[in-house]
């Protein structure tokens, strides 16, 4: 029973760093510091061993003598501390060792947004642990198990209260670490909003104005925004109407051009056909003219031959008349004259009968 109570009390209270130091309120933080110094005791001399610990570490029960004892007492000379802001907030940052108490590390970042809580004095924790130990010693084996359960629950509650105190009052070193490593919450939200606005793949509309009332109640929108939306809608409708009118005009112009081209092509084909017909008629007429000319030439030749024959006949007739007049009397001449003059109407078609 005594061993179980001592075990529970040992889990609740961290061991003292040096002789005569008070009990520590933050058990996890002190345990991580002791684990770090115990792990680094066998290594070479740490370059930051001679620096004095921050006042927060001295308040939590870790003195400079206890920290330097892991590397050998008096082995490293005193070195002046570096300027503010350059020292490491925790030993895990200097040597690259992961921080053992994850709750306190996350609580240091939350301390900026959560209000400060009142620190519970260490006397109350000691008194509560003492009362739990006394109750566990005075009970039986069955009661001892219940006391162990109560002690474990009380230790869990104390761990939670320690984490809450760590969240409420972060140390100065943790504040410096969070200020250096993590940007403020407002900067994160601002950068996130910028990233959302500047994300690739979101095309910007040129005609429509951006809507700034996304996720807001439409009933609570201001009348100016509603009027602006109506104006934008009217402008977009006007632009669409103008575009449609321009499209219709373009279509009409294209149709007119197409009809003009078709009419010009038809007229060109018609004129070409007429020209071909006229050329054919000209060729036919020239051929007919040639035949007529040839016939005319033939007629002229026939006329000339007939004229020559007529002249020969007339010469023969005249010579015959002269001979008849010389051989016969006047009666004969008269008869001959009558005979000669009688066929004149028959020979009048030639126009040269005497």
Swiss-Prot record:
Protein name stated in the entry: DNA-binding protein EMBP-1
Q: What function does this protein fulfil? A: Interacts specifically with the 8-bp sequence 5'-CACGTGGC-3'in the abscisic acid response element (ABARE). Also binds to the hexamer motif 5'-ACGTCA-3' of histone gene promoters.
Q: Does the keyword DNA-binding apply?
A: yes
- The segments labelled Leucine-zipper in the record are 278-299
Q: Residues annotated as region Basic motif?
A: 252-271
Transmembrane stretches, start-end: none
Q: Which residue intervals are annotated with compositional bias (Low complexity) in the record?
A: 127-140, 232-245
The biased composition feature labelled Basic and acidic residues covers 246-265
Q: Which organism is it from?
A: Triticum aestivum
Which family does the UniProt entry place this protein in? Belongs to the bZIP family.
């Amino acid at each position: 029973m005594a061993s179980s109570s001592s075990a529970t009390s040992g889990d609740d209270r961290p061991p003292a760093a040096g002789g005569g130091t008070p009990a520590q309120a933050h058990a996890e933080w002190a345990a991580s510091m002791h684990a770090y110094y115990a792990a680094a005791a066998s290594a070479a001399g740490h370059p930051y061993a001679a620096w004095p610990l921050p006042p927060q570490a001295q308040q939590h029960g870790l003195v400079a003598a206890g920290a330097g004892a892991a590397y050998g007492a008096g082995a490293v000379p005193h070195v002046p501390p570096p300027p503010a802001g350059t020292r490491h907030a925790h030993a895990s940052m200097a040597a690259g060792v992961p921080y053992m108490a994850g709750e306190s590390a996350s609580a240091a970042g939350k301390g900026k947004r959560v209000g400060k809580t009142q620190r519970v004095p260490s006397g109350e924790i000691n008194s509560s642990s003492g009362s739990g130990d006394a109750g566990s010693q005075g009970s039986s084996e069955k009661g001892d198990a219940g006391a162990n359960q109560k002690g474990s629950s009380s230790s869990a509650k104390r761990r939670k209260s320690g984490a809450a105190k760590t969240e409420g009052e972060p140390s100065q070193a943790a504040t410096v670490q969070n200020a250096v490593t993590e940007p403020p919450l407002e900067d994160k939200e601002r950068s996130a909003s910028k990233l959302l606005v500047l994300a690739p793949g979101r095309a910007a509309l040129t005609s429509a104005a951006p809507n700034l009332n996304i996720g807001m109640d439409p009933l609570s929108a201001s009348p100016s925004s509603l009027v602006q939306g109506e104006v934008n809608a009217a402008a977009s409708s006007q632009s669409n109407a103008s575009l449609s009118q321009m499209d219709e005009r373009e279509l009409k112009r294209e149709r007119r051009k197409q009809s003009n081209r078709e009419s010009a092509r038809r007229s060109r084909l018609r004129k070409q056909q007429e020209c071909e017909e006229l050329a054919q008629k000209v060729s036919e007429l020239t051929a007919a003219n040639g035949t007529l000319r040839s016939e005319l030439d033939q007629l002229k030749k026939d006329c000339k031959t007939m004229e020559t024959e007529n002249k020969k006949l007339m010469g023969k007739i005249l010579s015959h008349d002269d001979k008849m007049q010389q051989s016969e009397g006047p009666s004969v001449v008269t008869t001959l004259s009558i005979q000669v003059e009688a066929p004149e109407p028959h020979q009048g078609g030639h126009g040269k009968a005497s």
